[in-house]
């Protein structure tokens, strides 16, 4: 039986993580608390939906996300949530803590095992929401404007939190023209815009451009609308742009 199917054991474990003083006797893992839990642990159970990780629902306000695929080093989702929380950004979930350990077979390389994060209240999937309104021909201008402002605030915080880099404008121009040509092959209707777009890309040549980290996989499926506004999730990758 998978240990995460035992709700009594899960509840006891969650209480140790969030309320007690957990100690790994063999030193194989550590708990890092970042912020106080919003409520006492009443119950814990495994989320039954299809997910890339194992999610444990702790009461109504917390999720423990256990990573199925372990990667050496810091988990980016943990790092970004912690940084944005510290910056006072309210459009991401609150990180309450995380668990880390070591991989003995890999010369004790550190690895993050799980994150303890806010369970967002009454979330509505952004993709399902916007597409449903599109089918009904409902104006979504205010909704998407709010989402855009939310993303802008996050990216501004990422610019201040993480270092910026300088990139070669000529290389960017080459890459954009190459992508445009590939897009024209796939969608010939774009051909009439090629000259105008290429002219814009050419203006980048010879310039040094400041680039910052942004959400590396942003789409409506990474957004949730809650009573408190838009929330953006899953910072599993960041790219410079």
Where are these regions (language model features)?
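Conserved ATP-binding subdomain of kinase catalytic cores across diverse folds
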Residues: 1-176, 228-229, 238
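Catalytic activation segment of kinase domains across protein kinase-like and atypical kinase folds
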Residues: 163, 212, 220-239
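Conserved catalytic-loop position in the HRD/HxD motif
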Residues: 217
């Amino acid at each position: 039986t998978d240990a995460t199917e035992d709700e009594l054991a899960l509840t006891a474990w969650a209480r140790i993580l969030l309320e007690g003083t957990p100690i790994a006797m063999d030193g194989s893992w550590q708990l890092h608390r970042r912020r106080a839990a919003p409520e006492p642990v009443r119950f814990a159970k495994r989320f039954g939906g299809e997910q890339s990780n194992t999610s444990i629902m702790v009461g109504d306000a917390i999720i423990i996300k256990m990573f199925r695929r372990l990667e050496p080093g810091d988990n980016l989702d943990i790092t970004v949530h912690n940084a944005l929380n510290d910056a006072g950004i309210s459009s991401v979930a609150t990180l309450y803590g995380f668990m880390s350990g070591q991989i003995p077979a890999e010369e004790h390389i550190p690895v993050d095992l799980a994150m303890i994060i806010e369970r967002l209240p009454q979330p509505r999937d952004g993709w399902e929401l916007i597409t449903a309104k599109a089918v009904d021909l409902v104006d979504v201008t205010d909704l998407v404007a709010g989402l855009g402002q939310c993303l802008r605030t996050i990216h501004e915080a990422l610019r201040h939190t993480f270092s910026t880099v300088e990139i070669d404008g000529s290389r960017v121009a080459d890459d954009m023209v190459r992508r445009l040509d590939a897009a024209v092959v796939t969608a010939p209707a774009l051909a009439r815009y090629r000259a105008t777009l290429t002219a814009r890309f050419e203006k980048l040549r010879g310039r040094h451009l400041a680039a910052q980290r942004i959400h590396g996989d942003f789409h409506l499926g990474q957004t949730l609308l809650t009573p408190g506004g838009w929330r953006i999730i899953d910072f599993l990758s960041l790219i410079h742009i």
